[in-house]
Amino acid sequence: MWADIYHKLVEIYDIKAVKFLLDVLKILIIAFIGIKFADFLIYRFYKLYSKSKIQLPQRKIDTLTSLTKNAVRYIIYFLAGASILKLFNIDMTSLLAVAGIGSLAIGFGAQNLVKDMISGFFIIFEDQFSVGDYVTINGISGTVEEIGLRVTKIRGFSDGLHIIPNGEIKMVTNLTKDSMMAVVNIAFPIDEDVDKIIEGLQEICEEVKKSRDDLIEGPTVLGITDMQDSKLVIMVYAKTQPMQKWAVERDIRYRVKKMFDQKNISFPYPRTTVILSEKKTN
């Protein structure tokens, strides 16, 4: 008899456990589908909005899309979590009432969360940077991949993805907003003909100006900017469109190398002068 009762209880609890797991799985599936569906609607909304009469830069649209998706996901996560807690017969209302909103916030570190979210709001509101911008944040440089309510993600050229809490962002340098300055310093031996080199650099500047459409001003030969024991340095500078300074600098350096080869001008190298003295002996 006792064995029958035991097996009956096990059967009942097994049924309840399976039902509980199925309910949790159902909530998770609904949350997953809800997130995917919301992402699709948000994408469609901003795509249609970008084609409306009110034009916004594509970077701004990408930023708003990312931010809206993050906000909706947080809401769905919260609702799914509350539904799962309800399966444990835990009422969120009574939980907040018993614990107190203030103590619960402190206990879960919500102060930092609120700080991050407020900072994220002002980043968007003040248009400090957008998705796709190349920025330097707290000494870390990279391209902004995502701006969320809590964190900002930037990817460096070679050092991976950096995830920075919005509340920790103290200083931002945005290299995409305005024009940039391309600067190339050309060094050559001090005994070379300066006029010949300046003339060649001016020809290069004219060639670059005619061949590129990403220049705002220049390039211009500034003149000799440094004198050392064995070399002189001439600076060439140009104002470029955002994110084009490096391409312009590479182009100028390439043309300078070809010009030096054609004119038989050597690049400076360390020199050591040795003076030998001969002693006369009787």
Swiss-Prot record:
Stretches of the chain found on the membrane's Periplasmic side: 1-23, 88-89
Indicate how the chain sits in the lipid bilayer.
Answer: Multi-pass membrane protein
The record's listing under Pfam families reads:
MS_channel_1st, MS_channel_2nd, MS_channel_3rd
Q: Which superkingdom heads the taxonomic lineage of this protein's source?
A: Bacteria
Claim: Cell inner membrane is one of the keywords in the record: yes
Known outcome of mutating L276Y:
Loss of channel activity, possibly due to physical obstruction of the ion permeation pathway
Is Cell membrane tagged as a keyword? yes
Protein name according to UniProt: Small-conductance mechanosensitive channel
Key words of the record: Cell inner membrane, Cell membrane, Ion channel, Ion transport, Membrane, Transmembrane, Transmembrane helix, Transport
Cross-referenced InterPro entries: LSM_dom_sf, MS_channel_1st, MS_channel_C, MscS_beta-dom_sf, MscS_channel_2nd, MscS_channel_C_sf, MscS_channel_TM-2, YbiO_bact
The family note in this entry says: Belongs to the MscS (TC 1.A.23) family.
Any idea where this protein resides? Cell inner membrane
Matching PANTHER family, A to Z? MODERATE CONDUCTANCE MECHANOSENSITIVE CHANNEL YBIO (PTHR30460:SF0)
Q: Name one GO cellular component term.
A: plasma membrane
UniProt remark on domains: The C-terminal cytoplasmic domain is important for channel ion selectivity.
Predominant localisation class: membrane
Origin organism of this chain? Caldanaerobacter subterraneus subsp. tengcongensis (strain DSM 15242 / JCM 11007 / NBRC 100824 / MB4) (Thermoanaerobacter tengcongensis)
